[in-house]
């Protein structure tokens, strides 16, 4: 693994909890090679789809200067998290339907050199369909109707839907969305890998990183990740109802958003669930740390940081003797001191803390971490009798929203 983990104030799981964790692991193993919901994990071992993804990404990179991915939630957050590794910044993921945000982006684009990828598993996601229809009209007005089929690409299920009908009308190339891999669990599918590959990332390394974690978690007896699952279950049963993830790495801000959806939507069911809290060091030391240190003792903490970069910017001149204590320090020195002091004060208060320290940050390392969080979520769900897949409650809101929109036009 390309990161190390340390744990503080985590008790050994109770015997019955440990048994349930092992039963959950067995369930994951049994389902891994099938075509069930566990395909989101098993897909890590697939290779046949990679050529199509790489060929398409190469076509896009050779024919367009920029790509806009239109999706929301699980159709966007995985891609956004992976793209945090990209140095090219040639892909924008548009989640918002805030009129100002959408207008500013679309009006800033060189439409003739921009590709648009719409991602909707159902083909009916209101937000990304709305974005798509608006920018289609802009492309038609500026470049002509025939340009729509050249600039737009769809990723959706292979079934009749409004979006597949639109694709047929305009001859839009369409990729098949995996039927059993959806939403928050889809970063290893073409939903995550197409944008990542367009962004110049190594998609084989992304899949291999996931495999590394799967093999470790499922085949290493009494490993620390499974022990953590047991601790989380016991903490939850004893009143811990908030799950804080706080990286001291700016590029991981999208990881925390992805994790927030993963944890909340998977385990918030039947009157149960813990609240995921996304934070970022050091800024949220100045907004949330007071609560962590002196508020309710109801939180489990995961802090993420990295080894110091020898090329980190250094303070070589202080200009005032009052700042002499900073001379010679790098920004990474200061960041790590801020991190270590935060962890230490929480540990001293006997609060449950996990620390993940990356040796290096790249596609493989990130994917190892993402798969760890996915497996932890699935295993904790199975061990507590919660189905970690599906999100039946939110379907009610989607149906209501469509009814309200239809009524608005009457």
Model-found features: residue ranges?
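Short helix-loop-beta junction
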Residues: 82-90, 138-141, 262-273, 345-349
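A short, well-structured juxtamembrane/interface segment
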Residues: 45-61, 224-235
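Structural beta-sheet core signal
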Residues: 69, 116-118, 154, 245, ...
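C-terminal amphipathic alpha-helical interaction region
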Residues: 386-410
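Extended, charge-enriched "interface" segments that sit outside catalytic cores
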Residues: 1-58, 317-326
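Acidic catalytic cores of enzymes that act on phosphate-bearing nucleotides/polynucleotides
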Residues: 201-203, 215-345
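Hydrophobic alpha-helical scaffolding
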Residues: 92-95, 125, 153, 157, ...
């Amino acid at each position: 693994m390309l990161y190390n983990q340390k744990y503080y104030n985590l008790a050994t799981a109770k015997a019955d909890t440990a048994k349930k964790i092992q039963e959950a692991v067995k369930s994951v193993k049994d389902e891994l090679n099938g075509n069930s919901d566990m395909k989101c994990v098993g897909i890590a071992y697939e290779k046949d789809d990679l050529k199509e993804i790489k060929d398409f990404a190469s076509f896009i990179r050779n024919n367009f200067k920029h790509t806009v991915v239109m999706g929301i939630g699980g159709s966007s957050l995985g891609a956004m998290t992976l793209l945090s590794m990209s140095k090219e910044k040639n892909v924008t993921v548009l989640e918002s339907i805030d009129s100002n945000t959408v207008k500013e982006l679309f009006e800033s684009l060189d439409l003739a050199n921009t590709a648009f990828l719409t991602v909707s598993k159902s083909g009916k996601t209101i937000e990304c369909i709305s974005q798509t229809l608006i920018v289609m009209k802009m492309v038609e007005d500026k470049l002509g109707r025939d340009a729509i089929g050249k600039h737009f690409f769809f990723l959706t299920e292979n079934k009749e839907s409004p979006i597949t009908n639109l694709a047929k009308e305009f001859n839009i190339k369409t990729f098949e969305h995996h039927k059993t891999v959806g939403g928050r669990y889809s970063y290893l599918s073409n939903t995550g890998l197409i944008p990542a590959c367009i962004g110049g990332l190594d998609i084989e390394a992304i899949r291999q990183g996931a495999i590394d974690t799967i093999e470790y978690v499922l085949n290493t007896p009494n490993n620390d990740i499974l022990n953590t699952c047991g601790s989380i279950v016991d903490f939850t049963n004893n009143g811990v109802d908030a799950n804080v993830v706080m990286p001291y790495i700016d590029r991981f801000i999208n990881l925390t958003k992805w994790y927030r959806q993963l944890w909340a939507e998977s385990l918030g069911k039947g009157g149960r669930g813990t609240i995921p809290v996304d934070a970022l060091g050091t800024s949220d030391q100045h907004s949330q740390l007071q609560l962590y240190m002196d508020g309710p003792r109801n939180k489990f903490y995961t802090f993420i940081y990295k080894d110091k970069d020898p090329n980190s910017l250094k303070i070589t001149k202080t200009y005032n003797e009052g700042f002499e204590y900073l001379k010679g320090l790098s920004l990474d020195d200061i960041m790590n001191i801020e991190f270590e002091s935060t962890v230490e004060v929480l540990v001293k208060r006997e609060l449950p803390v996990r620390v993940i320290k990356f040796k290096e940050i790249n596609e493989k390392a990130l994917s190892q971490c993402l798969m760890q969080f996915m497996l932890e979520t699935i295993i904790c769900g199975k061990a507590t009798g919660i189905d970690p897949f599906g999100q039946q409650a939110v379907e009610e809101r989607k149906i209501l929203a469509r009814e309200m929109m239809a009524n608005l036009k009457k």
